[in-house]
Design a protein with these regions (language model features):
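Residue-level recognition of single "structural anchor" positions
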Residues: 1-190
């Protein structure tokens, strides 16, 4: 649903990672094993949230995070992150990097980087409300694309144009046959 080759985010961008999936007893943050890691990038638009990008990554290593940022954010942008070591390579990759270490200080993460945390909260609430908490990991990338599409067009005044854009995108990407969605393969099962 997200247009291939779409424009990258520009200006000032907040980037952080969140975890999507069911609850795990006694585990928090980066200790989580069964949840999927989703990187969130939110464009700053004054006090509001501009466009967003979301992507599931295999881990929170510098390589995974930089791959996402190169794909989602135009070079030269200012990227605001927490103190996680995975973001240390941003200046070498042609990005300005603003770090706010959030570890037991007076300021909470959602106060320092409100846009990215609002998007993560809305995503989780949307998944819970729409899918009743039944997020199947093999479909998560499709859910993230749908959420991104809807979020980035939330203030659109041209509803007809929205449908036109959706139809354009539907015919410009490879089809996802029922068998590949249900069984994870393009071969029909008998």
């Amino acid at each position: 649903m997200v247009r291939p080759g779409r424009d990258r985010l520009t200006g000032e961008i907040e980037v952080d990672e969140t975890y999507v999936g069911g609850p795990e007893e006694g585990k928090r943050g980066r200790e989580i094993e069964k949840k999927s890691i989703v990187v969130v990038a939110a464009e700053k638009n004054g006090r509001a949230i501009g466009r967003i990008r979301l992507k599931r990554v295999k881990d929170v290593s510098g390589e995974s995070l930089l791959d996402f940022i190169r794909e989602a954010v135009a070079p030269g942008a200012t990227i605001h992150t927490d103190g996680w070591k995975g973001y240390i390579g941003l200046p070498a990759a042609a990005y300005k990097h603003r770090v706010t270490v959030i570890s037991g200080g007076d300021e909470q993460a959602h106060e320092v980087m409100p846009r990215v945390h609002n998007v993560a909260s809305l995503l989780k609430r949307w998944l819970l409300g729409t899918l009743q908490g039944g997020v199947q990991q093999q479909h998560l990338d499709y859910y993230l694309d749908e959420f991104t599409f809807r979020f980035n067009r939330r203030r659109s005044s041209a509803r007809g144009l929205l449908f036109h854009r959706l139809a354009q995108q539907a015919v410009s990407v490879d089809p996802a046959p029922y068998s590949s969605i249900i069984y994870g393969t393009s071969a029909l099962r008998g």
